[in-house]
Amino acid sequence: MSVIYSTLTSLINKISDEFHKSFLFTAIFTILGFIENQWINSFFKKLYPSENFLNFLNKNHILKNHIFNPLIVLFVFAVFLLLALNSVSGSLAITLMLAFAGFFIGCAILPRYFLNGNTEKILQFKRKDMYSIGFCLILVSIVFFFISVASVGGIPLLKPSIRYLLKPILTMPVFLIIPGTCLVASAYLKDYHDREITRSQARFRFLFLLAIDCAFLLLLGYRTPLLAAFLIIIIIGFYGNIVSLWEVVVGALIGVGAIIGIGYFRSLGELTMTSSTSPIYALQSRADFTLHVLNLLDFIGGNFGVTHGHMLASSIPGSDLGPRMMVGKLIAWRTEVTVTPTLIGQMVVDFGKVGVFIEMGILGFILGIGFKLMQKTKNFFYTGIYALILTYSILGVETGILDIQVLVYFAIAIFIYLINIVRTRN
């Protein structure tokens, strides 16, 4: 396995080096270096609030130390349920209690019994390897962005109707910009910790990465990947001491505003609501519809499920129906569009209430181990990978964790965490 990894990283490093040596990228990085210096020495930068702005937030123990604890997934899930206009059914209430209990046991209790050995045995990853992989992923995503736009003959943000013409086989590689950003940001975090760049330089590079993500993902008209990029930068920056607590709180408010705003204007463009409708009501109605879907899925799934893994397996490319289209078919609604089933929708349909308890426990354990590993090592890579899986767990509260590339991210994280568990136990 180490031979395969070494061969792949060596090849990717060579590709990355060749691109960096090219005239185009030499010019780009020279210009960016100039802009970075202007930013650091800018007069306007001094007008920006200091790290101690809204200092009362730092006195809150939960915000300062546990804001991105894995339990935030349960908090977000609870808020999402409260947004709905109607209440949950009695059966779904039991399912939710099992889900919350399983997740809590998985993330808060079970990790205490692991990774208590010698931390020197924990796997270490080279900064250059992670940067090169991230850089190449971003390049691939940019190439497929232009291919996707050309395939539909326009920019989906400007023509919302053509967004549904986008082909998943072309847009899926575009979303590689998310893990690419995660790895490159983690590499910059390593540079900052090694004092190779200043905090101001690290902050500028984080902002630039976020700007690139916003530019490409927003033009495609996708909201969830855009929020993923935003969350990843915030989480890595917070645990790397690059982003202050008050910026996290303000960023969260901006993120909520973006969710409401993008959803509202998209609905206006698609004529599903009028301009007289409240943006808050638009968010509530979306949450209410998703909760209604979950109520139906819970009724269908029962105690032991009906599809027994077929919904999760439908995430694999080439399946007749994707998992969210399968949801539409199961609830006898519309099979030609995707329907979001929430974080536990797939679990309850595949394996029922029993499956929800077990799968939420597994998800909680993955996040709990990732959180513990990040805290013990303070390592740039483990900070990045935790940010990646926590981000998609939070966003999965509405959408579910059903996209094949996201499942691959979790599979990689599980593989790395298991190796570390075995190494530290021995």
Annotate the PLM regions.
Residues 109-243, 255-275, 327-329:
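Membrane-embedded catalytic interface detector for glycan/lipid assembly enzymes
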Residues 1-122, 202-215, 229-269, 412-418:
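N-terminal "leader" segments that precede or initiate the main folded domain
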Residues 160-164, 249, 256-368:
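Small-residue-enriched transmembrane helix-hairpin modules in multi-pass membrane proteins
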Residues 106, 181-188, 234-235, 239, ...:
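Transmembrane alpha-helical segments
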Residues 62-72, 129-134, 197-206, 374-386:
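Membrane-interfacial loop-to-transmembrane alpha-helix junctions, especially the N-terminal start
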Residues 88-90, 215-223, 396-404:
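Membrane-interface helix caps and helix-loop-helix hairpins in membrane proteins
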Residues 336-345, 349-426:
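Hydrophobic alpha-helical segments
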Residues 206-207, 227, 249, 357-358, ...:
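Hydrophobic alpha-helical transmembrane segments
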